[in-house]
Amino acid sequence: MATVPEPINEVMAYYSDENELLFEADGPKQMKSCTQHLDLGSMGDGNIQLQISHQLYNKSFRQVVSVIVAMEKLRSRAYEHVFRDDDLRSILSFIFEEEPVIFETSSDELLCDAAVQSVKCKLQDREQKSLVLDSPCVLKALHLLSQEMSREVVFCMSFVQGEERDNKIPVALGIRDKNLYLSWVKKGDTPTLQLEEVDPKVYPKRNMEKRFVFYKTEIKNTVEFESVLYPNWYISTSQIEEKPVFLGHFRGGQDITDFRMETLSP
């Protein structure tokens, strides 16, 4: 930042013998008398203001007027000052008081506001059994005739928040035009698959509760759905006709865990 010069030094710098010439013994007396009526108020609107007092000075009149001339030269000098960041910071520090700002955000709220991507699809197990809604909250697997295909359930598969690993994608399976989602409930020590009714104003959402979330894994032309909280527990169908869909603990045996998925156009 620019430093303010000492007034005395600056005055002496502009003091010269030329100022004295006005008051030499052989100088014009008229010039001396004119200085007695000098109007200092007409020197401009600078920051330096002088006032003449009628009291007696210890210094000679010559010295006083020399100081006036030097001060006038000093006033006419242009000082350049570059406005820097530190100057602005100093000004703001007098106006504002710094306080720590704490942001309280909820990841759940942000995730709920995020758009949920979903696809509509139909599922058939490897035995080509279709999934149908047999009663309000029971999902069964059975073979359908061509004229019965309208009974087949259409799923709304939502891609939800969760850790993706080993080609496993977290999804939630809801039934289209129904407020029903596949979830699990624990009965004793065994997780059991169920259709759970939800609030359509809240679901689907990005941050679904874990009971709704399954890992979708693609294996060749089929997909599997594994519980996120219960590894090696899969959405399964029985080889027996018209049995409810359940959560099974075995792969490659009597329980069918692989499905063919048909993606529907939006």
Curated annotation (Swiss-Prot):
Top-level lineage group: Eukaryota
Localisation: Cytoplasm, Cytosol; Secreted; Lysosome; Secreted, Extracellular exosome
Transferase listed as a keyword: no
Residue ranges listed under propeptide: 1-113
Disulfide bonds: none
Keyword set, alphabetical order: Cytokine, Cytoplasm, Inflammatory response, Lysosome, Mitogen, Pyrogen, Secreted
Entry GO CC: cytosol; extracellular space; lysosome
Entry-linked Gene3D superfamilies: 2.80.10.50
InterPro entries assigned to the protein according to its UniProt record, in alphabetical order: IL-1_CS, IL-1_fam, IL-1_propep, IL1/FGF
Transmembrane segments: none
GO molecular function, one term: integrin binding
Site positions for Important for interaction with integrin: K168, K178, K187, K201
Record-level GO BP terms: cellular response to lipopolysaccharide; cytokine-mediated signaling pathway; fever generation; immune response; positive regulation of cell division; positive regulation of immature T cell proliferation in thymus; positive regulation of T-helper 1 cell cytokine production; positive regulation of type II interferon production
Subunit structure: Monomer. In its precursor form, weakly interacts with full-length MEFV; the mature cytokine does not interact at all. Interacts with integrins ITGAV:ITGBV and ITGA5:ITGB1; integrin-binding is required for IL1B signaling. Interacts with cargo receptor TMED10; the interaction is direct and is required for the secretion of IL1B mature form. Interacts with HSP90AB1; the interaction facilitates cargo translocation into the ERGIC. Interacts with HSP90B1; the interaction facilitates cargo translocation into the ERGIC.
Family the entry assigns: Belongs to the IL-1 family.
PANTHER family per record: INTERLEUKIN-1 BETA (PTHR10078:SF30), INTERLEUKIN-1 FAMILY MEMBER (PTHR10078)
More about this protein: IL1B production occurs in 2 steps, each being controlled by different stimuli. First, inflammatory signals, such as LPS, stimulate the synthesis and promote the accumulation of cytosolic stores of pro-IL1B (priming). Then additional signals are required for inflammasome assembly, leading to CASP1 activation, pro-IL1B processing and eventually secretion of the active cytokine. IL1B processing and secretion are temporarily associated.
Cited function: Potent pro-inflammatory cytokine. Initially discovered as the major endogenous pyrogen, induces prostaglandin synthesis, neutrophil influx and activation, T-cell activation and cytokine production, B-cell activation and antibody production, and fibroblast proliferation and collagen production. Promotes Th17 differentiation of T-cells. Synergizes with IL12/interleukin-12 to induce IFNG synthesis from T-helper 1 (Th1) cells. Plays a role in angiogenesis by inducing VEGF production synergistically with TNF and IL6.
Record-given protein name: Interleukin-1 beta
Native species: Capra hircus
